[in-house]
Amino acid sequence: LGECEQYYKDRDFHFSRYEIALAYMALGGIPYYMDLLRNDRTLAENIDQIFFKNPQIKQEFEDVYMGLFSSSEKYVDIVVELGKHKYGMTRKEIADAVHTTSGGGLSTMLDNLQQSGIITTYPRLGGKRKVMVYQLVDFFSLFYLNYMHKHKTPTTGWGALQRSPQFFAWAGLTFEILVSQHIRQLQNALRIGTVTGMYNWRGMTDDGDGSQIDLVIEWHGERTDYLCEIKFSENVFAINADYKQALLDKISAFRESAQHIKSHSILLVMVTTMGVKRNVHSGCVNLEVTL
């Protein structure tokens, strides 16, 4: 993000950091698409021109995989399925979805996708055992699959879409991925030394509801677990009574889980686009990181 910010400054763009993040979430920092941006257009107008008014965009999506892999159709099938599951899929789930075996051929394709930076793997903890999950993290592919795959191209412009539930679902996921790709910067902001563990956590609250923590960072040197709630918002985010209770329930569920080392303290971190509004409910947040 820092490099993108400098790129825009050098070319006389005056995007806010919120817009720089949005551009990154759509274009993925790909130089080819960044070079198509014009500083006499708004970000919305630029995205309209690059994506929604570009009849070749489907071919460009397929060309990405044709240029990287032989048997590109099989790779595209995997990517399309992963695009339907925002928090990823296990190897068996992928094999079932693309109608193949969970053998060497699939392993090779998953390894190739991971080495190219299109997907990533991470441990999901909170159940009886650790599960490795494959997640699509290529921003261009996520944007294409969300808005244009199978003739989904919207008739309204990008500006209008930014008020839609579809936009906030896409933005919420891609902002989490954006944060995960800037872990070093997050560590620096939190003044964390050597990280001992980092993972997504799922568990159950006392009332039996499912609970998820977007990112857990373990720092054994300070005997502290940082529970990171990652929140995309176009404005300063206001925590209300219900949201505060949900956060406290997550902390309680994690504290009682097998993953939490009982001698460790817990710090709740809000990672947001625009910051957290100070109000009667925001005191539960121990640390805050913004763009």
What label would you give each PLM region?
Residues L1-E19:
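Conserved small helical "lid"/interfacial subdomain of P-loop NTPases
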Residues E5, Y24, E93-D96:
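The alpha-helix within a helix-turn-helix
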Residues F15-L36:
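The conserved phosphate-sensing helix
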Residues P31-Y33, L37-N39, L43-I213:
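Accessory nucleic acid-recognition modules appended to NTPase machines
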Residues I183, I213-E234, L247, L268:
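Conserved catalytic cores of phosphodiester-cleaving nucleases, focusing on short active-site segments
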Residues S233-A253:
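Mg2+/Mn2+-dependent nuclease catalytic core
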Residues D249-H264:
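Arginine/glycine-rich "motif VI" loop of SF2 helicases in the C-terminal RecA-like domain
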Residues K262-L291:
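Domain-level recognition of nuclease-like catalytic cores that cleave nucleotide substrates
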